[in-house]
């Protein structure tokens, strides 16, 4: 019996907003079960292994400020709000740029600072220039220096090895340029059989990488691993080792549930409003959060439907956890 292979990968839809790109890809026909294998693998690699540039270190030069729990004269936002906004800045760099990358903001007098006001070196681009950073009045005079570094996924500040000089505020590394990945399977006909798979993959990315480029990188990462495995077979045969190919045992990776439940809710990268509401109600970990139902969360003061939707989206994005009632 012939093994059914897909004809090609198609991009059936794509769009963009000021904040993100979107694309929908289709791969078919596939042998039954292969859409699950391919879709799940691509999703995991996309969400964990695509590198990008992010602001990770900040220094308030004028006026001098040394910690996030402070304010700046003439600036509406306090320092912690400014830092949260800087973590949302999306940066793209060319391959020839050396890291860390030094960035600066300087502004005197009344006005609004946006991400597009950040001074960047050649080869670096701010891809969401309309992002709000701070609001200044006529008394304001501010200068901020920043370092941007390259990384993957989410790296807490405490785990980052590179540390700048004294006076710098170290941020969590929010590197992942992939906002969300969904995949689903539909049946497709091949000849008289209608139970072959069609994989539909949807990818949302920040503006510093397009979905097709992110998918290309993910496929290369996967191919590199399988190429290494394939090349290893030759070494085994040369050593006189018989490779059993007829009785393969597949061991699926199991997520350590306790590890996820014990993670702090800070790792969800929620808005300050939602985060503060949860912490005031003694919700500190993912486990604490999952013990509450939707109705119970909505009873928390100042925690509304918008905050609940944000929590559900972040749980799915960061850990693949579906929280609350599923849509019919």
UniProtKB/Swiss-Prot annotation:
HAMAP family: RNApol_bact_RpoA. It catalyses: RNA(n) + a ribonucleoside 5'-triphosphate = RNA(n+1) + diphosphate. Residues 1-230 are annotated as: Alpha N-terminal domain (alpha-NTD). This is DNA-directed RNA polymerase subunit alpha. The N-terminal domain is essential for RNAP assembly and basal transcription, whereas the C-terminal domain is involved in interaction with transcriptional regulators and with upstream promoter elements. Keywords: DNA-directed RNA polymerase, Nucleotidyltransferase, Transcription, Transferase. GO terms for molecular function: DNA binding; DNA-directed RNA polymerase activity; protein dimerization activity. It is an enzyme of class 2 (transferase). GO terms for cellular component: cytoplasm; DNA-directed RNA polymerase complex. One of its GO terms (biological process) is DNA-templated transcription. Belongs to the RNA polymerase alpha chain family. SUPFAM superfamilies: C-terminal domain of RNA polymerase alpha subunit, Insert subdomain of RNA polymerase alpha subunit, RBP11-like subunits of RNA polymerase. It comes from the Bacteria. Pfam families: RNA_pol_A_bac, RNA_pol_A_CTD, RNA_pol_L. Residues 257-328 are annotated as: Alpha C-terminal domain (alpha-CTD). Its EC number is 2.7.7.6. DNA-dependent RNA polymerase catalyzes the transcription of DNA into RNA using the four ribonucleoside triphosphates as substrates. SMART domains: RPOLD. Homodimer. The RNAP catalytic core consists of 2 alpha, 1 beta, 1 beta' and 1 omega subunit. When a sigma factor is associated with the core the holoenzyme is formed, which can initiate transcription.
